[in-house]
């Protein structure tokens, strides 16, 4: 009885000799009902990687079969179809994006009690009641939808003592502001 180790199909293809007696592991014959399928690996004789003296030495002690599993999870066609969310069609997302992009440049007024702390040399700025300009809709990046928690980028101008008019940008949710001119 010879010791065997398991190889990935790519490695086995690179080192396999035409006369080697490889067999598929048991995971290749079992069908899974889960969306993730397992790609089987090849079990190759240990003699491909070790010298005969090491095999004889190891087999004289105790004959144990060593198999290393190297199954790789891959997505099946069912899982790819299951990933597509049937409730949100691409056309509705495109409509939402087009609607938001059409509003860029509009004047907005902040309705929620918000404070920002990222204006230079000012401890905090209260945004409630301030008017600004909608600069960008950032929930879509390079044509793909991203999970932006605050998708609207709004530019504000505020008069600060000793500094004059200061421009800063803040990201807000849709329910935190209202459109002044539509």
From Swiss-Prot:
According to its UniProt record, where is this protein located?
Plastid, Chloroplast
Q: Which GO terms describe its molecular function?
A: oxidoreductase activity
Span of the transit peptide along the chain: 1-81
Q: Name one GO biological process term.
A: photosynthesis
For this protein, the record's PANTHER family field holds:
FERREDOXIN-THIOREDOXIN REDUCTASE SUBUNIT A1, CHLOROPLASTIC, FERREDOXIN-THIOREDOXIN REDUCTASE, VARIABLE CHAIN
Q: What does this protein do?
A: Variable subunit of the ferredoxin-thioredoxin reductase (FTR), which catalyzes the two-electron reduction of thioredoxins by the electrons provided by reduced ferredoxin.
Q: Which family is it part of?
A: Belongs to the ferredoxin thioredoxin reductase alpha subunit family.
Q: What is this protein called?
A: Ferredoxin-thioredoxin reductase subunit A1, chloroplastic
Which species is this record about? Arabidopsis thaliana
Gene name of this polypeptide? FTRA1
